[in-house]
């Protein structure tokens, strides 16, 4: 977690407490593979029929477990190597604790949802469509439909010469812009970078400037 900026630079402002919850069985339920596990949290994949979407239905039961320590946010590390997780703003997050090479990336991606509600910047491969009406400005800091883009901090961070929308240029993969495609759809929703930890976890390991600034502002707000 603290290997990734801007969490790394703010490590001293976090308190992390682990609650160990013993279970009758080990692992996570995977309905699509007919794998069923009797565990304390009852975590399972295939939420909304998405293989990688791991969640916990009994939130009150999860809160009972977490209540053994003081907390502001709940994050569950599930005992599995299977890629996946989930995170909901001001609710809780969960991800695989033992994925061979992306455990940390999944953790910080989902925590981006949990801590301040960053939006998913990737396209497709979900069970829901039209989550962002194109005539409504998303409240998430890192997504826009350009309906009311001027009110976002993102707009103020742009170079005045940057075209909006911004064409993807492979020679400048980390140029801040307004790139079409995000919020699960190809058209009508825009993201700040061609790629970011809120987008494709396979090819990058940093947050874009918009996400980083939003995270820092939320940490500052919570630590006043």
Which residues make up each language-model segment?
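Catalytic Zn2+-binding segment of zinc metalloproteases
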Residues: 110-127
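Well-ordered beta-sheet/strand-loop patches within structured domains
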Residues: 54-93
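Propeptide-to-catalytic entry region of secreted or membrane-anchored zinc metalloproteases
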Residues: 1-64
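Solvent-exposed loop/turn segments at secondary-structure junctions
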Residues: 22-26, 80-84, 101-103, 121-122, ...
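Structured segments of extracytoplasmic/periplasmic soluble domains
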Residues: 1-8, 114, 118, 218-222
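Loop/turn elements at helix/coil->beta-strand transitions in domains of secreted/extracellular proteins
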Residues: 10-16, 69-74, 194
